[in-house]
A protein has these predicted regions:
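Cysteine-dependent deubiquitinase/ubiquitin-like isopeptidase catalytic cores across multiple families
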Residues: 1-229
């Protein structure tokens, strides 16, 4: 790194080398050859990924993707913003989760413009704080990033896409920060009504609330795992 008196992020930026590659295949090969730079436990992989996607999109293009005057890629305490999440999942740094564009008092609000490869579900939608569009809810691959109160995890259907007829299907849940020692599987039954909470406090696991933004009122069972409250 450069000058040791610089803050860590500035030292990293000063030491960066950029590479322009002619195709997606060349980019995949390059990342494969340098995977350790992104995956090393004591490295700067997350920061390198953010720099890479921002420069690939182009800083001016990423800025123009965002709602006027509101967008950044990093928020308070170094948390990623919705713009950064959208940039990672769709290649465009739009500020909202709904599909397409909307106008509010003459201001253009930008949502998901292109179909993403994987989806996203948000607990905030269950609480009425945002709207997630069909492009994120129905991705081509049965994989969904799950956002619950600034924390991100993932659910996926290992057996393929859920049945179009509403039959039961199994989802796997993975949380990198949870130090899981077992596979967490949930069975979702869209055609069966959700049972009332079986504890005295009436608590509903946040993950269930989030999944029901995609499969409303579905019955959800945790199979052999304890529900995460």
């Amino acid at each position: 790194c450069a000058d040791a008196t610089l803050p860590p992020r500035r030292r990293l930026a000063a030491a960066l080398r950029t590479y322009s590659l002619p195709s997606e295949a060349a980019a995949r090969a390059f990342v494969g050859e340098h995977a350790a730079a992104f995956t090393s436990a004591d490295g700067c992989g997350v920061a390198l990924l953010v720099y890479s996607v921002a420069l690939t999109r182009g800083l001016a293009a990423a800025a123009s993707d965002m709602d006027a005057g509101t967008g950044t890629l990093l928020g308070a305490h170094g948390y990623c913003t919705q713009e950064l999440v959208n940039l990672l999942l769709t290649g465009e740094a739009h500020s909202n989760l709904f599909d397409g564009e909307r106008a509010l008092d003459g201001t253009a609000l930008r949502g998901v413009g292109r179909p993403p490869a994987v989806g996203l579900l948000a607990l905030a939608e269950a609480h009425g704080h945002c709207e997630v569009g069909s492009r994120y809810k129905s991705p081509p691959a049965p994989v969904w990033v799950v956002c619950m109160e600034s924390h991100y995890s993932v659910v996926f259907a290992a057996a393929g896409a859920p049945h179009a007829d509403g039959g039961a299907f199994e989802l796997h849940f993975y949380d990198e920060l949870a130090n899981q020692d077992e596979t967490i599987r949930l069975t979702v039954r869209p055609n069966e009504p959700a049972a009332p909470p079986d504890d005295d406090l009436g608590l509903i696991p946040p993950l269930e609330e989030t999944l029901r933004t995609r499969w409303p009122n579905a019955a959800i069972s945790w199979d052999t795992s304890e529900p995460l409250l």
